[in-house]
Structure formats: C-alpha cells, structure tokens
C-alpha cells in the first residue's frame, strides 16, 4: 500500500506544481522555489502565489481529502456503492443552509473576517444535519436504518433542498445572486487563507474520528443480524459516523459549493486498489479525492482561458458518465 500512497502523493504534487506555475501569468521553476522558500523573492510572485494560486491548491486539497473520506464512509454505512453525499441530499442541505447565511448577511461571502468564514460552516452544518435527520426519519424501517431506502429518500431530499436554495437565491440582490450561483456550481475562485483557517479545524477534528472507526466500518458492511451478533450497536455507530460525515461535507460545501461525485468516484477507485479494509480505503480515498479536485480546478482554469469553468462542473462532466457506468454494471450484476 505504501507504493500506492506514494504514487498518488506524487501525482498530487505534479498537478499542484502545474497549477501553481501555469495560467495567464506563468511562473518559472526557479521563481516558484525562490518565492515559496523566501530566497530573494519577487514581490509580484509573492502576491500571485501566496494570495491567489497557493490558497486554491491548498483549499482544493482539503476539500478533496474531506469529500473522498466522507464518501467512502457513507458508502460503507449505506452498503451501497452508488451512495454519494450529493446524491443523498447532504450537499444540498448544507448548501441551503449556506445560501440562507448569504441571504441573512448580504455580501458576507466576500468578507474575509474569520467570524464570517466560521459562520458559513455552522449554517452548512445545520442544513446538512436537517437533511441527515430527514433521511433517518424516512429511511427508518422496522427499527433499523434501511440502506436501500436511504438512496431513494436522499434523492427526494436533494431535490427539495435544491429547490429551497433556488428560492432563497432569488430573494438576493443581483450581485449576491450571481455570487451564489458561481459558488453553487463548485468554485474555488474565492479561496483565501481565512477560509482555509475556518475549514481546517473541522477536518482535523472529524477525519481522525472516521479513520479511527475503520475496523467498525469493516464490520458494518455485513448484514444487520451479523453486526448485532457481534455486540455492536449498529444504529448508534451509524449515527456517529453520519454526523461526522455531515460536519466534513458542510465545511467543504461552505467554502467551495457543491463538488459532486468526488465522494462517489474516489472510494470506488480506492476499493479497487486497496481491497476491502477501510484502514487502507479511507486514506487512499482522501488522496484520490485531493487529486480529483486539484486536477478539476486546474483544468477549469487552464483549458477555458480567459474564462474559468468551476471545478464542480468539470467534476460533473467526469462524474455523470462514471455514475451511469456503475449503475449499468450493478444492474448487469443483478441480472447475471
């Protein structure tokens, strides 16, 4: 596994390098190193790298890490390889909470104060938790959380919260509405060190909790009777895991909008490479998620100059065919 981790870390570093040096204003390798390590740095390059490009790369890495790990956990909880935070409605719930924040505090999305940056993840957490609670209420069947119902309920909740977000967005003034639309499409254009400072504690708190539950996740993938026979309170553990996932997803959505399909694609690739043990799946899912989001942000920035396509749209272009492929593959397996 160490070689696989090293491979993806190397790929992340390569894409990050090109993201830092490429664009409308290119940076040579020597200038990049001298600026990053403060060896006779050029003030122009300092502004370009430390204020504009480096925050985007760091933010993309944090978001990819969080969504990749959260997606793997959600797939384990639901025992469904097609589960994804976006499909389940958690992204939409968190998004509705953050749109409400933007409506209540007009223009606060651009405020760089730490108070405003901290407020958005909290509103997102409230929205995400409401979505998760509704999933629990409607997916609860015969004293247990029905893994099959979770997906159907999640799709309905996703539609409901998306409609609510649109309704709230229409109440904004034109400038804030335009900002909200760009954000909802999954954009990292507004990344800055304040938002990184705001989202990082959520990752440092909840990701270790999920990784610490790796052995439990290996057990939860069995049927409910087997889990109960091992003396594990399945519903209690699922609740803890789901709350941790919602917190991570809400923090990611608050600073970058909806990054669809990261939580679907990364765990699938990870399971193919790492097998069935979650102590390997979760870290690898995080690394793959980092690579996906950094690459999508870089592609949207580079290939459509002078315009810029949000990373969320690039990920959706990749994710929809992959989702249909998995759906076809699952259906084919059931008919075999």
Swiss-Prot record:
GO terms for molecular function: transmembrane transporter activity. Keywords: Cell membrane, Ion transport, Iron, Iron transport, Membrane, Transmembrane, Transmembrane helix, Transport. Coiled coil: none annotated. Involved in the uptake of iron. Probably responsible for the translocation of the substrate across the membrane. Part of the ABC transporter complex FeuABC/YusV involved in import of the catecholate siderophores bacillibactin and enterobactin. Belongs to the binding-protein-dependent transport system permease family. FecCD subfamily. One of its GO terms (cellular component) is plasma membrane. This is Iron-uptake system permease protein FeuC. The lineage of its organism: Bacteria, Bacillati, Bacillota, Bacilli, Bacillales. It is found in: Cell membrane. It is a multi-pass membrane protein. SUPFAM superfamilies: ABC transporter involved in vitamin B12 uptake, BtuC (SSF81345). The chain crosses the membrane at residues 7-27, 57-77, 85-105, 120-140, 150-170, 191-211, 246-266, 280-300, 308-328. The complex is composed of one ATP-binding protein (YusV), two transmembrane proteins (FeuB and FeuC) and a solute-binding protein (FeuA). Gene3D superfamilies: ABC transporter involved in vitamin B12 uptake, BtuC (1.10.3470.10). Disulfide bonds: none annotated. Induction: Induced by Btr in iron-limited conditions. GO terms for biological process: siderophore-dependent iron import into cell.
């Amino acid at each position: 596994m160490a070689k696989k981790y090293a491979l993806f870390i190397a790929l992340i570093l390569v894409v990050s390098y090109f993201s830092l040096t490429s664009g409308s204003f290119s940076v040579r390798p020597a200038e990049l190193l001298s600026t990053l390590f403060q060896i006779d740095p050029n003030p122009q390059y300092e502004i370009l790298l430390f204020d504009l490009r480096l925050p985007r790369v760091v933010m993309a890495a944090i978001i990819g890490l969080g969504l990749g790990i959260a997606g793997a956990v959600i797939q384990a909880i639901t025992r469904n390889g097609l589960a994804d935070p976006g499909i389940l409605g958690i992204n939409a719930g968190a998004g509705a909470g953050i749109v409400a924040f933007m409506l209540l505090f007009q223009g606060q999305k651009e405020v760089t104060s730490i108070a405003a940056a901290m407020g958005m993840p909290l509103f997102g957490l409230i929205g995400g938790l409401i979505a998760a609670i509704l999933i629990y209420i409607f997916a609860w069947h015969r004293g247990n959380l029905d893994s099959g119902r979770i997906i159907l309920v999640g799709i309905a909740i996703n539609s409901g919260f998306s409609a609510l977000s649109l309704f709230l967005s229409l109440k904004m003034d034109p400038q804030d509405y335009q900002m909200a639309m760009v954000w909802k499409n999954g954009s990292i254009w507004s990344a800055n060190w304040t938002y990184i400072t705001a989202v990082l504690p959520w990752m440092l708190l909840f990701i270790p909790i999920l990784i610490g539950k790796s052995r439990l996740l290996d057990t939860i993938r069995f049927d409910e009777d087997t889990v109960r026979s091992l003396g594990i309170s399945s519903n209690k553990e699922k609740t803890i895991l789901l709350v941790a996932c919602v917190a991570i997803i809400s923090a990611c959505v608050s600073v970058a909008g909806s990054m669809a399909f990261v939580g679907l694609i990364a765990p699938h690739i990870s399971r193919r490479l790492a097998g069935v043990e979650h102590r390997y799946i979760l870290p690898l899912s995080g690394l793959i998620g980092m690579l996906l989001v950094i690459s999508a942000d870089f592609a949207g920035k580079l290939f459509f100059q002078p315009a810029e396509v949000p990373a969320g749209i690039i990920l959706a272009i990749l994710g929809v065919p992959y989702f249909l492929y998995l759906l076809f593959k699952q259906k084919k397996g059931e008919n075999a």
